[in-house]
A protein has these predicted regions:
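Alpha-helical scaffolds flanking conserved acidic
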Residues: 49-60, 95-104, 122-126
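Short acidic/histidine-centered micro-motifs embedded in hydrophobic/aromatic stretches
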Residues: 11-14, 58, 100-108, 148
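Helix-adjacent hinge/juxtasegments
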Residues: 78-84, 90-107, 115-121
Length: 235
């Protein structure tokens, strides 16, 4: 099985390094995938999910569809097909396990799910939570800034962002209404902060709480520094 996971890792490294991934590779490179694998394994172990090898495979493959789509919103469904075909060819999992991986990849970037039933979370919930954790904390901040570097830094009259304090539910409503989630970098950060509300496992919420608190402190400090300089006539 170790060799099979190495084969999966090699495929993902090669695929995400392909030029067709384009600018999405700034925040969705193999480093991101590896961090998601780390979080997914940590969540799965804490939440008593029975198959850590399956978790590792799903995490490694979750963004593979990015190399095959123009519309990023389709990368989950396209990636599920690619992952399923590769795993069947590899022959390392039973078909019912591969279906679980396909479902998790297909759903990992879908709208938020309702809270799961009591008991161990399914693979989809683990993968979604792990992917969300990589939006939070200092790593999430760097990913957000790097991926949205062409945007203005912040709104002039509200440095911490127009979306400051937005909830996960409100964010989902904005997306469903076709409204932009970020027109400035600070609102990209607010978008990522709001994603914390969509974490479903107790483990992920415990891990994410201090990370998202730090992001809020960062925005408050940014606003304080900018306002001080504005009052002094330096900006």
């Amino acid at each position: 099985m170790t060799n099979d996971l190495s084969a999966i890792e090699n495929l993902v490294r090669e695929t995400l390094a392909h030029p067709r991934v384009g600018d999405l590779g700034i925040a969705h490179n193999f480093d991101h995938v590896d961090r998601v694998r780390h979080w997914a394994l940590r969540i799965a172990a804490a939440e008593s999910y029975p198959d850590l090898t399956l978790v590792g495979a799903a995490a490694l493959l979750h963004d593979i569809g990015l190399a095959y789509v123009v519309d990023r919103s389709q990368h989950g469904s396209v990636g599920a097909e690619i992952a399923g075909s590769f795993l069947r060819e590899l022959g390392c999992f039973a078909d019912n396990q591969i279906v679980e991986v396909e479902t998790a990849i297909r759903e990992h970037n879908a709208p938020p799910q309702p809270p799961p039933s009591p008991g161990a979370p399914d693979l989809t919930t683990i993968l979604r939570d792990a992917d969300t954790l990589d939006l939070l904390g200092a790593v999430g901040l760097m990913r957000g800034i790097a991926s949205r570097h062409v945007l203005p830094l912040f709104p002039p009259q509200r440095v911490r962002g127009e979306l400051w304090g937005i909830s996960g539910e409100e964010l989902t409503q904005r997306r469903q209404a076709g409204l932009p989630t970020a027109t400035t970098i600070t609102d990209q950060i607010n978008f990522q902060i709001a994603c914390y509300d969509n974490l479903r496992t107790a483990t992920a919420r415990q891990i994410g709480a201090p990370l998202v608190a730090w992001m809020r402190v960062f925005l408050i400090q940014l606003e304080r520094e900018v306002d001080d300089r504005t009052q002094e006539g330096l900006l």
